[in-house]
Curated annotation (Swiss-Prot):
It is an enzyme of class 2 (transferase). One of its GO terms (molecular function) is aminomethyltransferase activity. The glycine cleavage system is composed of four proteins: P, T, L and H. SUPFAM superfamilies: Aminomethyltransferase beta-barrel domain (SSF101790), Folate-binding domain (SSF103025). The keyword Transferase applies. This is Aminomethyltransferase. Pfam families: GCV_T, GCV_T_C. The glycine cleavage system catalyzes the degradation of glycine. One of its GO terms (biological process) is glycine decarboxylation via glycine cleavage system. Its EC number is 2.1.2.10. It catalyses: N(6)-[(R)-S(8)-aminomethyldihydrolipoyl]-L-lysyl-[protein] + (6S)-5,6,7,8-tetrahydrofolate = N(6)-[(R)-dihydrolipoyl]-L-lysyl-[protein] + (6R)-5,10-methylene-5,6,7,8-tetrahydrofolate + NH4(+). One of its GO terms (cellular component) is cytosol. InterPro entries: GCS_T, GCS_T_bac, GCST_C, GCV_T_N, GcvT/YgfZ/DmdA, GcvT/YgfZ_C, TrmE/GcvT_dom1.
Amino acid sequence: MKTTPFTDVHIALGAKMHEFAGYNMPIEYGGIIDEHMNVVNNVGVFDVSHMGEFWVKGPNALRFLQKVSSNDASKLAVGQVQYCCFPNNDGGIVDDFLLYRYEEEKYMMVPNAANIAKDWAWCRQQNTMGAILENASDNIAQLAVQGPKATEVMQRLTDIDLNEITYYTFKVGSFAGCPDVIISATGYTGAGGFELYFYPQYAQKIWDALFEAGKPEGIKPAGLGARDTLRLEMGFCLYGNDICDTTSPIEAGLGWITKFTDDKMDMPSRKIMEEQKAGGLKRKLVAFELKDKGIPRQHYEIANAEGQIIGEVTSGTMSPCLKKGIGMGYVATEFSKVGTELGIMVRGRQLKAEIVKPPFRK
């Protein structure tokens, strides 16, 4: 199993470790609900060093991005971030990723850990225009400092005014005495905060500085278990669950990151997605809350009010904030309106549920 620069720290803290995307990662330290609520109310730190990082450079960088990304990279100014996906050739999704415009002709993609090899092969295959690609996944460490108190904790460790870093923008500078740190107002929790990218040799120094600075705010480490419940309460898609090779961005409600500008004519599956956007969808991803007691899980069947099977759960959990079962899943389009009554099949029983508008945690 691969390790991150923080693996020994997690083990020393008594974290419950488990293999995730080929890495030995902390699932929880003292309890998922406790870590979840600490991020919502205070501040928590996630090791996300397993995520990938690809540099895209040179005069053909933008041309390459306008082909492989679903979004319109020409709209990005230096210092801005964009949520995107790679459409495949069959109307599905290779992966979703964040795109950073680092310099005029230098961008950074941040794909999912489980898909680094697949995404890298896809990018190289699509790079017919000679953009300079570099896979820096093993040379960059990453921490997500998330929660309403993240700014006050982190401000003690940098001269950069963190209030100037608005949502989906970033700055590069000194943090905890370490140079060239990317401080990005992004995250997968919906609780506010930042993601930090830095060279692995600074990992211990940055970790120690954060936990020292955050003592008054009750800073705690958080594992991948809480990361999943937090993202699900926001209705954020997880690759491999809610989106995959066979789901289209339009079905998944990601039409807002799918652009059809004139400089994106050679984007894979453009025609398929344009047709879907014009109204040709058989199924849609919806968010639902259980009205009965129970926990929906991936692959559970979804029925309509009459008991006919109309879809399948892609993600589900017991929401720590709402204290009820919540989930997402694909249903036939005619049953996808907010307020529609559903039945979730749990061990032969049909539990009542209702389609809601995400996020679950308001």
